[in-house]
Amino acid sequence: MRRVLAVDGHSMFYAQQKVGWFFEPRNLLELAAEGAELSSAFWYAGLKDPSDQRPFRDALTNLGYTVRTRPLRELGGSGGSDSARGHSDQRQSDQRQYVRANLDVEIAIDLLTVAPRTDQVWLLSGSRDLDRLVEVLRAQGLQITLISTEGMVARELRNAADRFIDLASLRPRLEKGEAQQQPVFSRT
């Protein structure tokens, strides 16, 4: 069994916040390699600037991940040009909003490229935009395991996969020891 691992870093960051713990990328690689030959591991991340997350990205590369990045799209908060109205550039920069980098195309290209030499894909994402990719990979005979968490995964993506594993069920195997926190969306 040849397996490929693809981690949508943006989606997983928010899924991990929701469950209240963060996974260790090394543990994820070890889990993905159990019972299979892990032929490729990809990690996708949006960046505010080229130096953003540099130590983390370097650590991922050293572990064996292929790291793909794109700049986060930046939107102004006021909709107009503050400098044209005499406001300082500092105020304008304070109102910047960053939104998703959208690495779905990179995920699709990588997974379609490795598909001929792959039997199984572990996809860590919740993006509805990947449902058609999953359908195409399955039509090519690949088995797709989707890993995310309840409430953070699109129904269409979950329905397209062969198997769904809730990230919460993997906590004993994946959790980073020093990164425990309370769930962001706890119900009391």
Please state what every model-predicted region is.
Residues 1-188:
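Terminal and domain-boundary accessory regions
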